[in-house]
Amino acid sequence: MPGTAVHFNELELFFRQTRFAELVQYFVEMDDDSDDAEAVFPTSEPSRVSEGSENESGSGEEYEGAPHVHFQESTATEEPRTPSKTPASQTTQSIGRTVSIAEATRRASQESPRQTETAGSSSAPDALSTQQPPLEHSTQQNIPTKLPSTQQAVERVVSSQTTSRAAETRERSPEHTEASTQEAETAEEALNKEEFWNLYRSLESKSYISRENVPDIRLLVMCLKANLEIQGEFDRRRVGLKNRLYIILKDLVEEPWELRAYRGCRSADGLTLSVSFKYKNRPQFSGVKVDLEPKFLQESVVNIYYTISFTVRNVRPLTHSV
């Protein structure tokens, strides 16, 4: 609702991917009035922050805050690409063909002298023209007769490799089976529809949700993610569930607090710092101007620690999607 204070002076929680309990406490306390914000999140002395420009989603937000979250420009890294390899079957088959040709040549060279001696002893001297043809010709004739057996051997090698790979797959399959079993057990541990709504009503009746209720909220969130039927009924009842607990569960399921990118740079005069934040399922907050204190104007300063809090006015529905 307009005028609701959104406190981002605990942005270190986002940068460090904090624990679930702290995130729940954050969503619980961020719904408090702006007058009680300082008691919940005490800040240092506020410094001047100029009005920010409109963000990329088109909603006109004004930011007012006080510099102290660790700022560091994010850099994207690409995973190295592995070169494609020749399939083992093709390599084995080509090697088998080379070996078969060499073996056929060797056997032909061994058999040709024997055939020549046999023909010379049984025939007349003038029958030399009917003897075994030259070595090259006999080699070319014997190669086709030797190839089928060698090719069968190659096929046996390939089939044995396939069998060994299948055995390795069967050995690894218990791990995947165990993982799927754990997922099934986790789904079974989730609440059914009746238990879910009973637990939800018990939390809804509480005037204040504390850290002691974090396990129950975790169970509700896990149930919403695992059971699509309950999730659909939860969305259909959103008109009657527009209270603090509904907002907390919806935010925890959608995980909007996940910070996708953040960056900042000094202005040309070096007196201000321009910061931009991009969250999951939320538009980008850009153009946040922070006045730098004199101690940060030194050239040797690389990282600047600050806390920034701002109030969003002219609230509009956040329809940006990643």
From Swiss-Prot:
Coiled coil: none annotated. Residues 167-178 have a biased composition (Basic and acidic residues). Keywords: Plasmid, Plasmid partition. The keyword Metal-binding does not apply. One of its GO terms (biological process) is plasmid partitioning. Residues 35-188 are annotated as: Disordered. Residues 72-97, 110-166 have a biased composition (Polar residues). Plasmid partition require REP1, REP2, and a cis-acting DNA sequence (known as STB). REP1 may act by intercalating in the yeast nuclear matrix and binding STB either directly or via REP2. This is Trans-acting factor B.
